[in-house]
């Protein structure tokens, strides 16, 4: 599993790549029993991945302090992506959140760290046995279901 600083460095690099997919592997999916119990999905053997599309989407949709303030949230920073392993390994909440725009099932992992609630959304790519970052948000306090 890459270190937090390496993931943050990847996220910074990912912002400059729009014409092709680049990714960093974050390791095998853990918390398997909790995921299965909360969502019904068996992700044994799946790999967790962060790619430039997830980084770019998150920063475009949730990276503006002014926009997030209007939503009652806090802007995501590139360094926040380094928290993904912690958020997904020891989440406070896991839930299935339906399907995304391309029809893939999505799972939400929420965790409060130092008073900040992180909501990390991943899509399941069953054919390739991957879970890939779809989006991330953050706010003061915990996220509810």
Q: What are these model-predicted stretches?
A:
Residues 1-145:
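Ribonuclease/tRNase effector modules and their secretory precursors
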């Amino acid at each position: 599993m890459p270190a937090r600083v390496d993931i943050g460095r990847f996220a910074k690099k990912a912002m400059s790549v729009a014409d092709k997919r680049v990714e960093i592997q974050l390791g095998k999916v853990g918390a398997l029993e909790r995921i299965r119990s909360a969502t019904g999905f068996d992700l044994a053997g799946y790999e967790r991945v962060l790619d430039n599309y997830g980084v770019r989407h998150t920063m475009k949709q949730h990276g503006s302090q002014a926009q997030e303030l209007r939503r009652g949230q806090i802007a995501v920073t590139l360094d926040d992506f380094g928290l993904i392993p912690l958020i997904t390994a020891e989440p406070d909440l896991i839930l299935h959140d339906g399907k995304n725009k391309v029809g893939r099932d999505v799972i939400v992992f929420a965790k409060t760290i130092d008073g900040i609630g992180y909501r990390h959304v991943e899509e399941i790519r069953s054919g390739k046995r991957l879970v890939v970052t779809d989006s991330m948000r953050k706010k003061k306090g915990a996220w509810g279901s």
